[in-house]
A protein has these predicted regions:
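PRPP/pyrophosphate-binding module of the type I phosphoribosyltransferase fold
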Residues: 106-170
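Short glycine-rich loop/turn motifs that provide flexible caps or phosphate-binding loops at active sites
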Residues: 28, 69, 136
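Conserved PRPP/pyrophosphate-binding segment of the phosphoribosyltransferase/PRPP-pathway fold
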Residues: 41-119
Length: 170
């Protein structure tokens, strides 16, 4: 990636910037003209909190979230989201009034699995899928299928690089 094509975009959050690089980027399922680097958002606590605050604002008290399923190394942001959701008194169905933060195991065919110890964190739970970005939707579709297969309900899909997905069918 060329540094001269990179720049920062200030967001409405004081601790949050988008780091963007213009160019031509190829992925397995498509091409993109811009790369948004979310490494700092995923690793720096102040930025993770700012992202979490923005994402939590889309969920009101009628959205029940029991588990946050992390894709793309989003555990720090998920932890901040869970902290904000539980502090705000959001409902969940877990006996201890806490939110599970879970990362799936990826198998060779591109599917996600959960072992015996973690499958219980999906079964009968309302699961929010958290990812860094949505380009083609393939990975999020695989995650949604896994949640349904293990007996969970997809409560929503959140991404640090996608503001809102309208009319999504779970």
């Amino acid at each position: 990636m060329s540094i001269e094509n990179s720049y920062k975009i200030r967001t409405k959050g004081k601790n949050l910037f988008l780091r963007v690089t213009k160019g031509h980027f190829m992925k397995t399922n498509g091409h993109m003209n811009y790369y948004i680097d979310v490494a700092m958002q995923k690793a720096r606590l102040s930025e993770a909190r700012a992202v979490a605050e923005e994402l939590v604002s889309y969920y009101n008290s009628s959205t029940v979230i029991d588990t946050i399923l992390c894709l793309d190394e989003m555990q720090v942001i998920a932890t901040c989201m869970a902290e904000q959701l539980t502090a705000a008194g959001f409902m969940n169905l877990n006996a201890h009034q806490t939110i599970y933060i879970l990362t799936p195991e990826k198998v060779s065919e591109g599917r996600f699995i959960f072992r015996e110890g973690t499958a219980a964190m999906i079964k009968g739970k309302n699961v929010l899928i958290l990812t860094s970005s949505v380009a083609t939707g393939r990975t999020t579709s695989v995650a949604m299928d896994a949640v349904k297969y293990y007996g969970g309900t997809v409560a929503g899909l959140a991404s640090s690089c996608t503001k809102k997905i309208e009319n999504a069918f779970f």
